[in-house]
Amino acid sequence: TSATPLGVLSHGSFADVYNDGFTKMDLFLGNVGGCIGEVSALAILIGGLFLIWKKVISPIIPVTFIATVFVLGLIWGGFDGALFHILAGGLMLGAFFCATDYVTSPTLPLGKVIFGIGCGLFTMLIRIFASYPEGVSFAILLMNILTPYIDKICEKRMYKLPKKAKEGEK
């Protein structure tokens, strides 16, 4: 067995990851070590796009989740870092298959955007600043806790009723 790319990154830098023989193409095709379901970004992407095409899931959560990780990856590691964070670990699996769970994700479009951004933010905070190299599952769980509050905020915003008139006013 060998270290996973995120494990190597947690103890070094992007140079260490690429010096250990991991290439972006290896990450994309799944020619690296890792847990089942997190190694082939290509296979997960095909499966996720199929679910979107069949309208089983909405694209809002996966797109905002992955885009948030990409933007924060640009900030903390440049373009190579952004691609690495998207292709390594369980991000693609979490974005397409876990975060889109009907029961634990928001129902309204604005809520889905907030949920996806929150998942991406927590994922990157855990990956960059915590001692645990993978943060996707924890990020999704944290956002699942916040889902009722996100739904409540978005529901009030979307279905806002007009203010009641004061007595004597029409």
Predicted regions and their residues:
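Loop-to-transmembrane alpha-helix initiation sites
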Residues: P62, L83-L91, G111-F115, S131-M143
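Hydrophobic core segments of alpha-helical transmembrane domains in multi-pass membrane transport
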Residues: A43-I52, F65-L74, L93-C98, C119-R127, ...
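Divalent-cation-assisted or electrostatically stabilized phosphate/pyrophosphate-binding catalytic cores
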Residues: P106-T107, K112, G116-F129
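Interfacial loop-to-helix junctions that mark the boundaries of transmembrane helices
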Residues: G30-G37, F79-F84, T107, S131-Y132
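Cytosolic-side transmembrane-helix boundaries in multi-pass membrane proteins
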Residues: P106, I126-K170
